[in-house]
Amino acid sequence: VSQIVESGMLMNDRPAVLRRRSWSVIFGIAVVGLGIGMFIAVLKVTSMSGFRTGWQGIPVYLVIAGLIGRIVNCKVVLREDVLTVINPLRTHTVPRAVIDSAAPGEDGGLEVTLSGGRTVPVFAYGGSFIDHFRGTSGAAAETINRWLRTGSDPDGSSAGAAVSWTRCRPADVAVLSGVLLAGGGALWMALTGG
């Protein structure tokens, strides 16, 4: 199964989370595999050229792991009256009252259509090759549409959709660490010369 519906449909006042299970598995394999590969590469370059050159793979690994982490963080969260689409860079928080429907787009990716015709793309269901055979975007759309039908009637007082920057602490720490390490290492290399 390529999606997880965590904690059911709002069971015990907990939100339902729609995401691809495969992304978590791929992330784990990629981070561990890249980590082992990068460690071996750093050791090899260090043994041939010294640590002055060998360390440079470490920030590259941290930035790549952070970017992969942002992708894996993508999901759709269904709360009582709010749908939240968490994409790699932007998070869309949309009240139930302004959502018309959810459906797979022409490219196979999931889209949430708001009143007024605006659509919010869902990166977590971005129309992958597997989607065309497994129909995971369609299944996620059905779950969202069922959530829309089972909710309370909108009272008309809901505000519009809000968009904010996505926060993903582990990924952000990895990217920031990579950038700081690269900057610090470049400064160290410049100061020590040679």
Feature map (PLM): residue ranges:
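A membrane-cytosol interface segment of integral membrane proteins
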Residues: L114-D172
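Acidic, Ser/Thr-rich low-complexity segments on the non-lumenal side of membrane proteins
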Residues: H92-Y125
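Alpha-helix capping and helix-coil boundary motifs
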Residues: M48-G54, F129, T136
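Hydrophobic alpha-helical transmembrane segments
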Residues: F27, S49-Y61
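A broad, low-specificity signal for short, low-complexity segments enriched in glycine/proline
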Residues: G35-M48, V60-I64, G69-C74
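Conserved beta-hairpin
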Residues: Y61-S101
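N-terminal membrane-targeting/pre-transmembrane regions
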Residues: V1-M48, R149-G194
